[in-house]
């Protein structure tokens, strides 16, 4: 079992291969409500993570974003591919 820091590093590497930028920010200090998640900003793919959330939540946000992209042509850690495949299978059954 990987520790949470190595899982986050694996996810950041996968996102980087897809040219997805990841920013961690204090979202409580914003003038308007922002939640962690994926967006496009000036044509660039971006994941914004609230620094006040636990690392486990960061993992989920990045994983949910990676599910939207084609990962067939890039290397991603086995656990990421397994998790995404498991989630897709579970979603197809419901």
For the regions a language model picked out, list residue spans one by one.
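Short coil/turn linker and secondary-structure boundary residues
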Residues: 3-6, 53, 71-75
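C-terminal structural segments of small proteins and small subunits
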Residues: 63-87
């Amino acid at each position: 079992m990987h520790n949470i820091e190595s899982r986050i590093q694996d996810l950041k590497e996968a996102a980087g291969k897809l040219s997805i930028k990841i920013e961690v920010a204090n979202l409580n200090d914003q003038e308007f409500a922002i939640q962690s998640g994926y967006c496009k900003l000036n044509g660039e793919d971006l994941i914004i993570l609230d620094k006040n959330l636990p690392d486990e939540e960061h993992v989920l946000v990045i994983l949910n974003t990676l599910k939207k992209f084609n990962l067939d042509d890039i290397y991603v850690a086995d656990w990421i591919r397994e998790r995404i495949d498991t989630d897709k299978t579970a979603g197809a059954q419901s």
